[in-house]
């Protein structure tokens, strides 16, 4: 991979432990740049970067900058952060994460995956198909790819596959060759203000691709289908509907995942063919749909049908996307990042496909603003759960919003007809509640983008202790999710 044309000195990342920031930092480090950073706490990403030799300070202080020549920040970093203040006082450039990602993308041809849900899994699927076909792509993803143990990799090929984060609008700056849009729901309205502004951002994202590129768009989603009509670029559509250029049919599922045929139709020539019996070792129709995006990209890059089948058959998914953390007394525990009502609904339907018993959902709502703006949707997205346990809202730095609380959601679910809902007094009480509720064959699905992932990973051992089981069962990662 080419480097940037000028020497830029040490690159300092504020919030380097974030999933998006850590991936860019890792690729820059592997390109030979001097990279350092800081974060408010240790985490998996910080530990991984340190093993690579990247210096990471815990806590934000002006002195952390050292000899930094450029500072990279995400939208989560406030303007009064002491490192940002010090950088600006010293006339050190402060750039956003998306701007640095865009500069990396200029060095290769790139596939950028956007959408309010499914980006991370779809990005990893595109990367898996390109990797299986020998493209050796550079990858920057929004989640840990199980096969790599990281969310980023510097490849030797000419292509890069990236997740395009729409949360702060900066994805419109990414110079993609191929754009993917999985779906488009009202989200991040604290930034956009209105859904119309969000639509306009997705329009610009697609319009940014060059005339020789194309956009893969999911026409199962009405907002994305409307985008097809507005786009002035080459379009390849995908989905379950009969009008899609890449369509899944004959979908079946069991404990091994999903099996389906893929019909591929050429709009111009009228030619059609079928990729038969694709096996995706993941649960849920939403993941079949995500795979169609990757197939649409792959076939338009000349990847053979048999290679597509082979790559998907060994696909191992993404961390925190329907990840099995363990089992206790016949009860399986799942950890999933889903925190939007659409994602939660899809994950619970996948749990129905994967399990033989009841589904018990444990949800930690993420952000007061999201719970408030989508309250009605949250009250109706748990119908596939036999029981729901609601934890306190994970604030993510926000102040409480009236009517957006654990108690309000419990009452809202009951008012909307759910038969079995209860509040979680504290994380420490979870194992006891699950022990009383769950029976062998049941599945406990922990949902949320906050600290609930730690609860999900501890829960099997805590249940073992309550059942008097010594040793327990070893966790076995199984992918699914969004």
From Swiss-Prot:
Keywords: ATP-binding, Cell cycle, Cell division, Cell shape, Cell wall biogenesis/degradation, Cytoplasm, Ligase, Nucleotide-binding, Peptidoglycan synthesis. The keyword Nucleotide-binding applies. Its EC number is 6.3.2.8. It catalyses: UDP-N-acetyl-alpha-D-muramate + L-alanine + ATP = UDP-N-acetyl-alpha-D-muramoyl-L-alanine + ADP + phosphate + H(+). Transmembrane segments: none annotated. GO terms for biological process: cell division; cell wall organization; peptidoglycan biosynthetic process; regulation of cell shape. GO terms for molecular function: ATP binding; UDP-N-acetylmuramate-L-alanine ligase activity. It comes from the Bacteria. It is found in: Cytoplasm. Pathway: Cell wall biogenesis; peptidoglycan biosynthesis. ATP binds at residues 115-121. The keyword Iron does not apply. GO terms for cellular component: cytoplasm. Pfam families: Mur_ligase, Mur_ligase_C, Mur_ligase_M. It is an enzyme of class 6 (ligase). Its main location: cytoplasm. Cell wall formation. Belongs to the MurCDEF family. This is UDP-N-acetylmuramate--L-alanine ligase.
């Amino acid at each position: 991979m080419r480097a940037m044309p000028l020497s830029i000195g040490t690159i300092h990342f504020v919030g380097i432990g974030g999933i998006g920031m850590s991936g860019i930092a890792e690729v820059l480090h592997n390109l030979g740049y001097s990279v350092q950073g800081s974060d408010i706490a240790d985490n998996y990403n910080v530990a991984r970067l340190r093993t690579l030799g990247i210096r990471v300070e815990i806590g934000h202080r002006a002195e952390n900058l050292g000899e930094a020549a450029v500072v990279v920040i995400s939208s989560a970093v406030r303007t009064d952060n002491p490192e940002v203040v010090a950088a600006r006082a010293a006339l050190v450039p402060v750039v956003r994460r998306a701007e640095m990602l865009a500069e990396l993308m200029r060095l290769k041809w790139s596939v950028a995956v956007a959408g309010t849900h499914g980006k991370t899994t779809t990005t990893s699927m595109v990367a898996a198909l390109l990797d299986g076909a020998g493209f050796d792509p550079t990858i920057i993803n929004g989640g840990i790819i199980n096969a790599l143990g990281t969310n980023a990799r510097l490849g030797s090929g000419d292509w890069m596959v990236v997740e395009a984060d729409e949360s702060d609008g900066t994805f419109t700056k990414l110079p993609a060759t191929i754009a993917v849009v999985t779906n488009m729901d009202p989200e991040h309205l604290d930034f956009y203000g209105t859904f119309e502004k969000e639509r306009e951002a997705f329009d610009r994202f697609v319009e940014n691709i060059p005339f020789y590129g194309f956009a893969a768009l999911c026409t199962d989603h009405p907002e994305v289908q409307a985008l097809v009509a507005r786009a002035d670029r080459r379009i390849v559509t995908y989905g379950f509907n009969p009008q899609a250029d890449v369509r899944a049919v004959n979908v079946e599922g069991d404990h091994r995942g999903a099996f389906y045929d893929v019909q591929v139709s050429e709009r111009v020539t009228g030619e059609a063919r079928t990729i038969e019996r694709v096996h995706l070792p993941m649960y849920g129709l939403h993941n079949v749909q995500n795979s169609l995006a990757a197939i649409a990209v792959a076939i338009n890059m000349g990847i053979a049908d048999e290679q597509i089948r082979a790559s998907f058959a060994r696909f191992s998914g993404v961390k925190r996307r329907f990840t099995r953390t363990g089992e206790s007394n016949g009860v399986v525990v799942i950890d999933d990042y889903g925190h939007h009502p659409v994602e939660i609904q899809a994950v619970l339907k996948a749990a129905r496909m994967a399990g033989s018993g009841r589904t018990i959902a444990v949800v930690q709502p993420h952000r007061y603003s999201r719970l408030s703006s989508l309250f009605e949707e949250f009250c109706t997205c748990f119908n596939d759960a036999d029981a729901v346990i609601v934890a306190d809202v994970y604030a993510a730095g926000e102040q409480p919003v009236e009517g957006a609380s654990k108690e309000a959601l419990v009452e809202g679910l009951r008012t909307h007809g759910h038969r079995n809902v209860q509040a979680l007094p504290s994380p420490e009480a979870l194992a006891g509640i699950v022990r009383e509720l769950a029976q062998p064959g049941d599945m406990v699905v922990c949902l949320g983008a906050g600290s609930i992932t730690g609860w999900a990973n501890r829960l099997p051992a805590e249940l073992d202790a309550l059942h008097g089981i010594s040793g327990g069962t070893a966790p076995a990662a199984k992918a699914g999710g969004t």
